[in-house]
Amino acid sequence: IGGQIMAEWRGTSPPERVMLKKEMGDDVSFQAKTLMTLWVVSLNSKTEAFKNKKVRQAINMCIDRHAGLKKLAKITFTAPRPSGYLLYNSTYALPDEELYKIPGFTKDIDASRKKAMAMLKEAGAEGLEFTYSNRAVSHPYDHIAIWLMSEWKKCGLKPKMMTNPTSKFVKIRREGGFDATIDWAPSFLPDPTLMHFKYISSDRTASNYSKYIDRDLDKLFDGQAGETDVAKRKAIVHQFEKKALENAWVLPVTYTDRVIALNSKVKGYVIANSHILNNTWRGVYLD
């Protein structure tokens, strides 16, 4: 952007934006949009300790999604607030007042961690050691990983991170060679049929890397997909969200805050909330 390229289309981190603005001044401009890509942690259903729902829930409850996500958003391109599986504030998303009642999303992190540690003790999983598979890309993977490690350790857990290049990371995720793994759920529309497909039974979707089977979720998914009344569909979708969040096989981290950097000579481009939208360059020109 400083003379070699005209734009960075994937996204820039907050420190990168500070550097670009300092070096380029008025010669750089930025556009921002919340990307419809949710970062999640998928827990392996084959890991013995994770077969206990209380252990999965406790791991989820150790994460401070309120103050913690605000801090994380200052160093990488993640949203500064919690979300369920559906994009927050979208038509079918759980309202905040309902989401924040669910364990792992409450605002009282001290009480949440105290209860989580009691649940781990009850399950015989105090000081649980488990592997966390990370993709060897700085933003936002390393930043999310380091943050999650620190959150879990506050509950006495002992996660061990294994970081691999993309090809090996993808192979490990696909073959289930992990206890927990960073994962993501991209979409181009905030629609439950698109955004909940990842969380139905693994014999119906290849993107369920936890590999669990849940026919109740399948039934709710099919029910909302065939419902044309918005209010009735929303009620079914909320049932799905609450059940999937309670099951805690896939733990939402947050959505992506996408900010692209453009040389100020680039005009006419409008950022989209998906990497696959608005890529025709129609109307884009150099001034």
Model-predicted segments: where are they?
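Extracellular/periplasmic solute-recognition and catalytic clefts
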Residues: 1-47, 184
